UniProtKB/Swiss-Prot annotation:
Organism of derivation: Gluconacetobacter diazotrophicus (strain ATCC 49037 / DSM 5601 / CCUG 37298 / CIP 103539 / LMG 7603 / PAl5)
Catalysed transformations (reactions): uroporphyrinogen III + 2 S-adenosyl-L-methionine = precorrin-2 + 2 S-adenosyl-L-homocysteine + H(+); precorrin-2 + NAD(+) = sirohydrochlorin + NADH + 2 H(+); siroheme + 2 H(+) = sirohydrochlorin + Fe(2+)
Function: Then it catalyzes the NAD-dependent ring dehydrogenation of precorrin-2 to yield sirohydrochlorin. Finally, it catalyzes the ferrochelation of sirohydrochlorin to yield siroheme.
Region (Uroporphyrinogen-III C-methyltransferase), start-end ranges: 224-470
Name of the protein this chain belongs to: Siroheme synthase
InterPro entries: 4pyrrol_Mease, 4pyrrol_Methylase_sf, 4pyrrole_Mease_sub1, 4pyrrole_Mease_sub2, CobA/CysG_C, NAD(P)-bd_dom_sf, Siro_Cobalamin_biosynth, Sirohaem_synt_dimer_dom_sf
UniProt pathway: Cofactor biosynthesis; adenosylcobalamin biosynthesis; precorrin-2 from uroporphyrinogen III: step 1/1; Cofactor biosynthesis; adenosylcobalamin biosynthesis; sirohydrochlorin from precorrin-2: step 1/1; Porphyrin-containing compound metabolism; siroheme biosynthesis; precorrin-2 from uroporphyrinogen III: step 1/1; Porphyrin-containing compound metabolism; siroheme biosynthesis; siroheme from sirohydrochlorin: step 1/1
Gene Ontology BP terms: cobalamin biosynthetic process; methylation; siroheme biosynthetic process
Keywords recorded for this protein, A-Z: Cobalamin biosynthesis, Lyase, Methyltransferase, Multifunctional enzyme, NAD, Oxidoreductase, Porphyrin biosynthesis, S-adenosyl-L-methionine, Transferase
Length: 470
């Protein structure tokens, strides 16, 4: 049969509690399979001349049974009857294939590890979250790819999935009794999972989750919620798992000017997008109107994502927004993000602290007041032994550098500007307080950009390019 017409492997779940499983082999290959089998409460007999250390410890604890000896045809033939599954897990392919042939002759499912051809079943890469089981298989064609896929899936699975699954399991009979109609029951579960009830269950707040579920069963509409989420400095790979989860579950998203398209692509595709355009003093939507819009949408039952660059509580006006939500009685969550100072500095190769020259780091905003002046703690800023990270400081960069020199820092004090930090088109300019404004102007540096001031700039590390062919 050609690869194009081969139907492949049929996935199914098998209950192994108390079932006898024979494993031939006592080394590292066998260990990986025995670990999985023990997690599913199988009764394991191992045929091998000797056991590696972990297997030997499990044998001493009575968790497995060891039949000492080589995998001769007679020994294998005597051991296999009555077993539910067989694993041929030695480091000798010929031995594994001989074991597989004997198991096949007895109609016992057998897996010759890393050798699909003689196997009647294979063991996929697995993810466990309580009652939830996810299996990923490439049909034995590419086990490393299956493991990589498992890692990616695990990365986006919410941490509370186990608690959610157990809650649903516990409430299933209650929902069936309260809602006999299958179609309506399915809609109740969908609304529960997509709303605050599912979120509460994931957090282990079962009383709150049960209250939401009972409201849905009674025909009530669930209330909305606002999520203030920090999206990090720009690279989508720097999103937290929690941020990504909420981005993919929001009904609507209010987002700012500086979020790159690659990051916005991670938002649920059918979510309504509302651009509020906050950038310095140019606002598509004033802050009071943003607050009102968040409240309006939440009261309409929406799960509203307020997506902000960096961290919502570091120069992001997140504090003002949650005060408005609290006053209106709107439930909310805050998800921190990697702030620009740490993200951009790391990608630029500039440490924020250094034992030799910077024992502290000061975050300030370069956003001028309405009259154009900078209201900053200049005496605290113009000190050696620290790093200054200046947010939104490009426009006021000449004044910032002038004032730092006026308050005591030397003109040749190191400084840098990181434009579009963490993104593919990131630029880093290094200089001094005396020449950085001219450098930034000559290179037409724009927002978003972060200014770093301090001796740490001289410790910048530039990552070398990868070697050819790697």
């Amino acid at each position: 049969m050609s690869d194009a017409t081969d139907p492949g492997w049929f996935p199914l779940a098998l209950r192994l509690r108390g079932a006898r499983v024979v494993v031939v082999g006592g080394g590292g290959i066998a260990l990986n399979k025995v670990r999985l089998l023990l997690a599913h409460a199988a009764r394991i007999d191992i045929l091998a001349p000797r056991l590696e250390d972990t297997l030997a410890a499990w044998q001493a604890e009575g968790r497995i049974t060891h039949i000492a000896g080589e995998a001769t045809p007679d020994r294998v033939r005597a051991l296999l009857p009555g077993s539910r599954l067989v694993y041929a897990a030695t480091d000798d392919r010929a031995v594994n294939r001989a074991v597989a042939a004997q198991a096949d002759a007895l109609n016992i499912p057998v897996c010759a590890v890393d050798d699909p051809e003689p196997s009647s079943f294979i063991t996929p890469a697995q993810i466990h979250r309580g009652p939830v089981r996810i299996a990923i298989s490439t049909g034995g064609a590419a086990p490393v790819l299956a493991r990589r896929l498992r890692e990616r899936i695990e990365a986006v699975m919410p941490a509370g999935l186990d608690a959610l699954a157990r809650f649903l399991q516990a409430e299933r009979a209650h929902v069936v009794a309260a809602c006999p109609d299958i179609g309506r029951r399915r809609r109740v579960w969908e609304d529960f999972l997509d709303g605050p009830g599912g979120e509460a269950a994931q957090r282990g707040e079962h009383a709150a989750a049960r209250q939401v579920l009972d409201h849905l069963l009674a025909g009530a509409q669930t209330g909305g919620e606002v999520w203030l989420v920090g999206a990090g400095p720009g690279d989508p790979d720097l999103l937290t798992l929690r941020a990504l989860h909420l981005m993919q579950n929001a009904d609507s998203v209010l987002y700012d000017q500086l979020l790159p398209p690659a990051l916005m692509d991670r938002v649920r595709r059918d979510a309504e997008r509302v651009f509020v355009g906050k950038q310095r003093d140019r606002h598509t939507m004033p802050q009071d109107d943003i607050n009102a819009e968040l409240i309006r949408r939440a009261r309409a039952g929406e799960r509203v994502l307020r997506l902000k660059g960096g961290d919502p509580f570091i120069f992001g006006r997140g504090g003002e927004e949650i005060e408005a939500l609290m006053a209106a009685g709107i439930p909310f969550q805050v998800v921190p993000g990697i702030t620009a100072a740490s993200g951009c500095a790391a990608y630029a190769g500039i440490p924020l602290t250094h034992r030799d020259c910077a024992q502290s780091c000061l975050f300030v905003t370069g956003h001028a007041r309405r009259d154009g002046t900078l209201d900053l703690p200049w005496d605290s800023m113009a000190r050696p032994g620290q790093t200054i990270a200046i947010y939104m400081g490009v426009t006021a960069l000449p004044d910032l550098c002038t004032m730092l020199v006026r308050h005591g820092l030397p003109p040749d004090w190191p400084a840098a500007v990181v434009e579009r930090g963490t993104r593919p088109d990131q630029r880093v300019l290094t200089g001094t307080l005396a020449d950085l404004p001219a450098l930034a102007r000559a290179h037409a540096v724009g927002s978003p950009a972060l200014v770093l001031v301090g001796q740490v700039v001289r410790h910048r590390v530039v990552t070398p390019p990868p070697l050819s062919g790697t």
